[in-house]
Amino acid sequence: MAKEKFARNKPHVNIGTIGHVDHGKTTLTAAITAVLAVTNGAKMMDYDAIDNAPEERERGITIATSHVEYETNNRHYAHVDCPGHADYVKNMITGAAQMDGAILVVSAADGPMPQTREHILLSKQVGVPYIVVFMNKEDMVDDEELLELVEMEIRELLDMYDFPGDDTPIVAGSAKEALDEAKTGTLGPWSAKIQKLMAAVDEYIPEPTREVDRDFLMPVEDVFSISGRGTVVTGRIERGTVKIGDAIEIVGIRDTQKTTVTGIEMFRKEMDQGLAGDNCGVLVRGIGKDDVERGQVLCKPGTINPHTKFTAEIYVLSKEEGGRHTPFFTNYRPQFYVRTTDVTGAIYLPEGTEMVMPGDNVSITVELIHPIAMEKGTKFAIREGGRTVGAGVVAEILA
């Protein structure tokens, strides 16, 4: 049997379910696939298949995530669901599964809970741009006023973390009832609420800008000198495109340098342009082999700057995950592995936080000893003696 080709006839969007434990994230994921299996030929995934998520490794951290795919009339979705709270935290901080938007599941019977708040905060910190809310377990609430109260609480919570509370779509329903309905092959009133939710997701979460359409950025992995041709910088293009003749900048570690691309090669073949995802060599004019080093980036001029001080959201590996066995305190100085290199930096803890235990996630301020090209959303690993002890994402640039 020939391998099925991925048909690109619909825009592709990555989403995920977030929210407090036992509010019904996985049941909702199963219900969406079940309802869309009846209408759009999605492959139905039952609860157990989603809940027994395979483990993946990302930046040296093991994360259990379930990937489900389905289609609405307008789009193709890849949907990620994590079984445990720690998996969510790790997933969002490492960016193991990028999310263009999220479905926040809140139990109508319980209202927002601590992890509801934490997942909204994390979404803000790691740059999940849009949230749509599903108020689950509506079948367990008889009081209309209680539903309105929970909805109001959710909107206030979103506002608190700079999401547009008033404009966020909130759809009430019951994932369990919808799942039971869809399993019979006939859709009823509960399934209609799942369809309403997906219509809101279709409409409210915009199509993401493709990596190719963004500003050019390539982390430097290696530098060679080719006699008669000059200096070649190799790496994998993270985003954007680069063409022969383009003016580019070399940013990070040292003073920013300007240069022009005189050639692009991939697999020893000449190319006119390199695209996001390509591993290639870029020939640069007037730059010596010793003027560039691993850890810098090539980029479109003026699009990314070198920084040393920032705030970040980090997850610290537990002892079982191969992390530290002891807590660390303010002024801890590990290495920060950003894109292709390690840079030493000092960690400052927020006021009122005495220490950070293995397994915690925390907001910190970092000061690096060298400037590195970075922006909000840049991911990094925290290492000590060559082993990963944490992972983080830049929340805000300070200097």
UniProtKB/Swiss-Prot annotation:
Q: Where in the cell is it found?
A: Cytoplasm
Region feature (G5): 174-176
**ATP-binding recorded as keyword:** no
Q: What is its main location?
A: cytoplasm
Q: Which CDD domains match?
A: EF_Tu (cd01884), EFTU_II (cd03697), EFTU_III (cd03707)
Which residues does the annotated region (G3) include?
Answer: 81-84
Please state every residue range assigned to the domain named tr-type G: 10-209
What this protein is reported to do is described as: GTP hydrolase that promotes the GTP-dependent binding of aminoacyl-tRNA to the A-site of ribosomes during protein biosynthesis.
Recorded protein name is: Elongation factor Tu
> Mind giving the lineage of the organism this protein is from?
Bacteria, Pseudomonadati, Campylobacterota, Epsilonproteobacteria, Campylobacterales
